[in-house]
Amino acid sequence: VCLNVRRADFVNNPLANQFHGFCDSSYLQKAAERILSIHPEVAFYVFSDDIAWCQSNLQLPAPTTFVDHSFKGQKFETYLYLMTLCNHFVIPNSTFGWWAAWLASNKQKIVIAPENWFVDKSIVTSDLIPQSWIRL
């Protein structure tokens, strides 16, 4: 399972935070538990721009590997490619995670996405999240 966590600009940039908000550890834990209820044998691969925060704040109930974010800059496509190799996805309100889930070839993939993509809940996102993905 690719568990993608976006924090840096969504947390540290007041304008980004005001518009996007961010997915907290509660969402990530609930999403992980949801996938485990369907596939109890999975392992998690955490991809994030803030691995230290993830290591301190996520206690996933399955084997977990924290993937180093040394693929910044020109190597971002390698990071994205590694994400697409996962079978299932927990994504935040981030297009990077969205593209990883979208591009993954597993036809039976489970994708969990946040119910609210933006702070302003009146923004329509029905065309953003495919019907087969689970909103949480």
Predicted segment positions?
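Structural signal for conserved beta-strand scaffold positions within catalytic alpha/beta enzyme cores
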Residues: F66-D68, A113, R135
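Leloir-type glycosyltransferase catalytic cores
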Residues: D120-L136
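Tryptophan-centered motif/residue detector
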Residues: Y27, W53-N57, W98-W102, N116-W117, ...
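Core catalytic architecture of nucleotide-activated donor-dependent transferases building glycoconjugates
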Residues: V1-Q74, K107
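A donor-sugar binding/catalytic signature common to diverse glycosyltransferases
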Residues: F76-I123
